[in-house]
Amino acid sequence: MFEAKVKKQIKSIQFGLFSPDEVRNGSVALIVHPEVMEGGVPKTGGLIDLRMGTTDRMYLCQSCGGDNFSCPGHFGHIELTKPMFHVGYISKIKKVLECVCFYCSKIKIPRKGIKSTLSNVWGMSKGRSVCEGEVLDNGRSGCGNKQPVIKREGLTLVAFMKGEESNEGKVMLNGERVYSIFKKISDEDSVYMGFDLKYSRPEWMILTVLLVPPPAVRPSIVMEGSLRGEDDLTHKLADIIKSNGYLKKYEQEGAPGHIVRDYEQLLQFHVATFIDNDIGGLPQALQKSGRPLKSLSARLKGKEGRIRGNLMGKRVDFSARTVITPDPNISLEEVGVPLEIAKIHTFPEKVTSFNIDRLEKLVRAGPNEHPGANYVLRSDGQKIDLNFNRSDIRLEEGYVVERHMQSGDVVLFNRQPSLHKMSMMAHYARVMGNKTFRLNLSVTSPYNADFDGDEMNLHMPQSYTSKAELEELALVSRQIISPQSNKPVMGIVQDTLTGLRLFTLRDTFLNEREVMSLLYAVNLEFCDIPLGDAVQTGLRKGKDYDIMKILRKPAIAKPMRLWTGKQVLSFVLPNLNYIGLSSEHDDDDKENIGDTRVIIQDGYIHSGVIDKKAAGATQGGLVHIIFNDFGPKRAAQFFDGVQRMINAFMTGIHTFSMGIGDTIADPKTVKVVESAIRKAKEEVSALIENARQNRLERLPGMTMKESFESHLNLVLNRARDVSGTSAQRSLSENNNMKTMVLAGSKGSFINISQVTACVGQQNVEGKRIPFGFSHRTLPHFVKDDYTGKSRGFVENSYLTGLDPEEFFFHAMGGREGLIDTAIKTAETGYIQRRLVKALEDAIVRQDESVRSGNGLVYQIKYGEDGFDATFLESQKVDVKNFTKRYYIDMFGTEELEIKHGQVSEEVYGMLSSDVDLQKLLDQEYEWLVGEIFEGPPILSVGEVDIERDYKVRDIYQSAVMSPCNFTRILATAKRTFHLSTGDVSPYYILEAHKHLTTSNRILNVLIRTNLSVKRVLLEHRLNTEAFNWVVEVIDAKILKAKITPNEMVGTLAAQSVGEPATQMTLNTFHLAGVASTVTMGVPRLKEIFNVTKNLKTPSMKIYLDREHGKSIEAAKTIQNEIECLTVKDLCLFSEIYYDPEITGTEISDDKDFVEAYFEFPDEDVDFSCLSPFLMRLVVDRAKLVGRGINLEYVAMFIRKELGGGAHVICSDENAVNMVVRVRTTKSEDESLNFYTTALNSLLRLQLGGYKNVKKVYISEDKDRKEWYLQTDGICLSQILGNPAVNSRLTISNDLVEIAETLGIEAARESILRELTIVIDGNGSYVNYRHMSLLADVMTMRGYLCGITRHGVNKVGAGALKRSSFEETVEILLDAALVSEKNICRGITENIMMGQLAPMGTGNIEIMLDMKKLDKAIPLSNPVFKPNEPATPVISTPSSDSFSISSGNWSPTHLEMAYSRDLGERLSPTSPSYSPTSPSYSPTSPSYSPTSPSYSPTSPSYSPTSPSYSPTSPSYSPTSPSYSPTSPSYSPTSPSYSPTSPSYSPTSPSYSPTSPSYSPTSPSYSPTSPSYSVSMSSFSNKNKSKNQDGDKKRRNDGSF
């Protein structure tokens, strides 16, 4: 049945133009009649001629005989009377015309040395006005004719000679004329212009035969009665046929030229609007109703068009949608599905011998009873509907039953908008009553869902492969940690979080009955789950969930037994170690009086209140640790356990509700609030008075008004804060509102202060409410009222209620927020789509490189380290007391040596006597210093004081991301292996460093600092066994964190950057005049992705060299050098006077210095030709002094700029007014306008600084303790040339300028920097690797490539991929013109073709060795016949395999022996091993010594056989060689080859389905270096130690 469905793969697509012959050959009918029907039947030669196929049930296709379902449709054609332009190609036709000679059709220029593409040839030819052709021996090959200029007018082209643009000289070029020119173009010329002789010739751009699409493409609708509604295309084709017929008729009749021309233009119009009905400058073709017709192009374009609407994404079957409702008792991994949906959604299950009985029951139940089945598919392909004949159906193997969805089925659940991959996750269905989907509360945050009426979609997988992929890749529990910011996306929320805080307070005590009910609430059915896939499995002391551990030890024994909440909660935790602080923590509280230090050891909560910091979706919180160390399953159970326990506590023991009483502050607080507001009002009045009296001081960089507003804001905000804090303080500890804020489940302290004390200032566009009309905000305020009340300060709280005007202002502020959100959604949605399209095919290959579908390399190693962000945790490099902690000096400084008694004798002996070892230790220390610090080179170790002389490298100052959490691994080791003194040989430690060395610098530093010899021996005091364990765990973690090949990291990066954008603000408000007025949020993100040339706020951050950076005065001199200074900047005001007395003046203020000047005037000035108009500039003395220049310099500068024609004099430096007078020579135009223009150009003269730098602010860098300059405006190349500037640290925010000045690598760094600034500024965090991939995609081509249709969509990708983004039709037309061949390697192409896209699991090929198949053992039935006990059994997914050599296989008791509990299975007292176990009873019939197959003489069961001897060491339950943590027990270890009799590959502890040994788990890869033989240096040296330890540990039943 399935074999017939194997499809051929489309490997590539060839685009091209149809030649007229191809159209005629491929057509089945010549269409000549515009009518559709004749006498009630489709008319032959009409537009729905039956030869083209049919859409009507009543007819069959006359070409293929198919009916309306099976016939795909066949094309017809129309013979056009005259050639017509193809509207999509008119601009290209014009280009070709400009390339070739109008008369002889040769290319106008010599062909040598030009690349053969149309645009290149056209660029060279379009200016040539003579046909030159090739250079030959006897001259030129061209005809030498003068060439016309060609212009496009509407749908026609016009030719005229240069200079004769009048109507007489114009010649209309119709299709016929151009066709004749194109037909004469030679083959080599066509190829030279980029055409292809086989697929696209120039004359084919002109239509002579029109292809008619079959009726299937344009089906008609039959209305009631006999009316038919035809499709838009049919109408259009009818118009074409009509006008074509008229044109033919008139031409044959010899009608006047203008009539023929009119009909030709009409036909051209119809042909054009058939193809595209949105041509600029042309009227649209309309239907009778006035609606524009939908053309062919419109069908392809846009979101609803063919490409994006029907090929890239389709509507699917087996999907359901309904409202979602919360359910506190459903598991995190489940979704409650309404029964109605479960009956409709089916899964096709194949009938086998194992499930035939179950499926027969379902078939009998039928479609209306759940669980039942809807259809049966027989082997011959027949589908039987079970609604009718289900009683007589006999199932056979190979049939397929479409059974109902049942509880436990995997389904895909989704909420739109799907912004990141956690918006689609797999859940297990749980079929329930009612009509809504039920959802666990913690899973709402990744979906961004709430329950105010949201709807969600559910999809049912339809094959075992998709089911397996959902379960292994998309399951909720596997998505708990997001690769976006390497932290959990789910945490405990809402009431559970509130309850969690109350539950773990110090005063929560529970009696025996309550404890029992809480423990009962935690569903214990999963207590035998595997303990996670970390190597740490080896460390369990007893099982998780040991109830007695808690019940045996109540916190209070007398007078009654009471347990604390912390004790009971510990029951839900695995054996983890965690130290953290809760949100109320006060650093001064050293004694932990507030119980804010959370300490959990071995899964037992010792102290601390658990709130959002520990149990929420926080980095390094409990959820994060459980997921990383114990696996996804265990994390999901933590959620379920906590929720069930706390919900039971909140419903029955300690209920919680909030009422109006929680918002009322006490009378004392009310007084405090009132006085704070009263004081603020007084301060505001004083401020207004000061401003009116001009006593207010102006703040730097602000106008007077801005300074006033800034002062006011400070006062009003202070009032709100003071009243808010006092209100909070007054609320008691058990106030319910405060409880929620402290737990982190809802609200913040601002909310509390607004509800109880004062709502505060309302803002619009970041300022106070603006005046609306005639200087008021609302009509009942007086004019120019600047007080708080009038400008939107709300002094009431929500509790007391707002006044009408306060309410109005509050609504204004709220309205702005709504508008902002609405606009932002559209903007960020588009940004997200562009990002995904640009990065969609970036995929990690087998070699860890990231490449595009075409094989272009984006990154040599993904994220520069090859790790998957999901498994990373943040780590700090510890540099405190560096030398003391890391350097061992046994032969020098006494304080740096290791003392006797601090380590074992053996190690001390080595350290104190071995000089070679000391050299190695010196090298290790020097390497560390070199990697972590930048500073003077190391002369000899110990001479330099690292703390003083060196600076830690920037990268290690903040937290770095690493796959191992060293602190936690070491803490676990210390608690597990009872340690006293370090006894690991230093050589062995250094050897381990070598073994763990990776290509990742940061990781190497982390490994060598945390496992440095001195710290291992003194600080951690590890023994060899513990050290080996630590090394193994680190090794396994590093392997596990490697990125999986074929992961779609591009899409992941796009989502990770796009999703935070939806949280960003659209408009960024800032206080005016503060230096940090740079664009942020969505507008800045758009600037980065679009690579905008003109930024809104271009700015540079300029660091200065040592001498200028240290003092503010020195920095000011540089500020003056850089800031642009014009004449206007220095002037207080400027004026134009008519002052005809040249040697004197009418202006009284200037009399003195003018007369003084004219007593001794300059000799060479001719005063008679000076103008009577005078430009007078009054200069600001303060500015002159501030810029350090004098008035004479300004006058001299103006003189120099204006040249000899002007006369400039200035007043004395000490005069009251500093004045510069400028007169020009008389001009012909002596109007005032002339002088106004002259004055303006004079004011624009630049006296100093850089032209683009409008303003420079001085700021202080607190970390570096130096001053730097922040500019408004940029000129990077000039600034870097300034000797006082530290060019290494100076940065600009203009990517284009950086790329031009410093090159592409610098641009890449600055894209990263700018992205980080925007995302951090919004309070989000995105892992570095996503932004680095984005930056690489934007810069990999060597130039900046924006994420727009002009950037990424222009280059490299195939036509199909580009057309799926934007400009669909244009791209496809161009592809046909240049006969592009699109090879289907990318994602888009394969999705369009309906093929499996090469991504993720679809990118895996199976390599099969056919020769090995000859030796294969045939599959046997897993039932033993008495005579074949030793047949090898092959395991299939549907049968368990028990090899006879598997020691714990009992034929009579499968369940016990195959229990999944690790602890039970290997415990000597486990029933399946106990000699008293019924299944091992010697009298059991299956063990009867007389049973033929167990005859004592049977060779395979001979009691003397060494491998089956009960006393044989290989079967001793305490045998050391079976410890799963023993390093020598490696699957690839030679001594345990699968052929060894004592190692059974089918032994249950190595079952391929065991989650902890999943073949897909990265940490158990057979090629894993940590399991390779090279690890023997760890396993052999301490085998004996390990075995002793294992013996000790195994007796308590831990394995």
From Swiss-Prot:
What post-translational modification information does the record give?
Answer: The tandem 7 residues repeats in the C-terminal domain (CTD) can be highly phosphorylated. The phosphorylation activates Pol II. Phosphorylation occurs mainly at residues 'Ser-2' and 'Ser-5' of the heptapeptide repeat. The phosphorylation state is believed to result from the balanced action of site-specific CTD kinases and phosphatase, and a 'CTD code' that specifies the position of Pol II within the transcription cycle has been proposed.
Q: Which protein are we looking at?
A: DNA-directed RNA polymerase II subunit RPB1
Q: Name one GO cellular component term.
A: mitochondrion
Q: Where is the composition biased (Basic and acidic residues)?
A: 1585-1599
- Give the protein's function: DNA-dependent RNA polymerase catalyzes the transcription of DNA into RNA using the four ribonucleoside triphosphates as substrates. Largest and catalytic component of RNA polymerase II which synthesizes mRNA precursors and many functional non-coding RNAs. Forms the polymerase active center together with the second largest subunit. Pol II is the central component of the basal RNA polymerase II transcription machinery. It is composed of mobile elements that move relative to each other.
Q: What else is known?
A: The binding of ribonucleoside triphosphate to the RNA polymerase II transcribing complex probably involves a two-step mechanism. The initial binding seems to occur at the entry (E) site and involves a magnesium ion temporarily coordinated by three conserved aspartate residues of the two largest RNA Pol II subunits. The ribonucleoside triphosphate is transferred by a rotation to the nucleotide addition (A) site for pairing with the template DNA. The catalytic A site involves three conserved aspartate residues of the RNA Pol II largest subunit which permanently coordinate a second magnesium ion.
Which terms under GO biological process does the entry name?
A: transcription by RNA polymerase II
Q: Where are the sequence repeats?
A: 1473-1479, 1480-1486, 1487-1493, 1494-1500, 1501-1507, 1508-1514, 1515-1521, 1522-1528, 1529-1535, 1536-1542, 1543-1549, 1550-1556, 1557-1563, 1564-1570
**Statement: the UniProt record of this protein carries the keyword Disulfide bond:** no
EC top class, in one word? Answer: transferase
Biological source species: Encephalitozoon cuniculi (strain GB-M1) (Microsporidian parasite)
Give residue spans, biased composition: Low complexity.
1435-1446, 1467-1581
SUPFAM superfamilies reported in the protein's UniProt record:
beta and beta-prime subunits of DNA dependent RNA-polymerase
Q: How does it assemble?
A: Component of the RNA polymerase II (Pol II) complex consisting of 12 subunits.
Positions of Zn(2+) 1 binding: 61, 64, 71, 74
Q: Which UniProt keywords apply?
A: DNA-binding, DNA-directed RNA polymerase, Magnesium, Metal-binding, Nucleotidyltransferase, Nucleus, Phosphoprotein, Repeat, Transcription, Transferase, Zinc
Sites where the protein binds Mg(2+) 1: 450, 452, 454
| Reaction equation(s) it catalyzes | RNA(n) + a ribonucleoside 5'-triphosphate = RNA(n+1) + diphosphate
Q: Which Gene3D superfamilies is this protein grouped with?
A: 1.10.132.30, 1.10.150.390, 2.40.40.20, 3.30.1360.140, 6.10.250.2940, 6.20.50.80, RNA polymerase ii, RNA polymerase II, clamp domain
